[in-house]
């Protein structure tokens, strides 16, 4: 695999938006309640997506492909996913899992996964935070996307809808997948 993936037009557009935003950002926050899904299942998921087939379980319509550019074998901080998904248009993303202590987004829940989407120079363009904690019926999860301030509103709405669908899928597939695979890691 080449070190630098081919860019889709959406990557170039995001880099232009980032420059025009001049360091200003906005946050998109989406809250979820997941019945029958535990924080431990979600913790397991992040390091065990592993294949495009498994990645597509998370959003059968929009997720197209997945591979580790840098695997999480030694812990997920520093791991890089290379994914293709459809958020209004085909989007190639390189997401690097970051140390939660370096999160520019305040963390409020007991479990947190922090990621940055990388530009062609491996610098963060956007940030995301999945944070979650147990509730009586399962897990409450909050996703926060920190985006350049000049991101078009239609993209923000498409991202919100994508996130709602993707996180809601956890309740459908994750309990069984976790139960079948939790000891094989």
What are these regions (language model features)?
Residues 30-32, 94-101, 125-134:
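Hydrophobic/aromatic beta-strand elements that line small-molecule binding cavities or substrate pockets
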Residues 32, 39-41, 75-78, 86, ...:
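A compositional/structural signature for long, glycine/proline-rich flexible linkers
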Residues 174-185:
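Short, highly charged C-terminal tails/helix-capping segments
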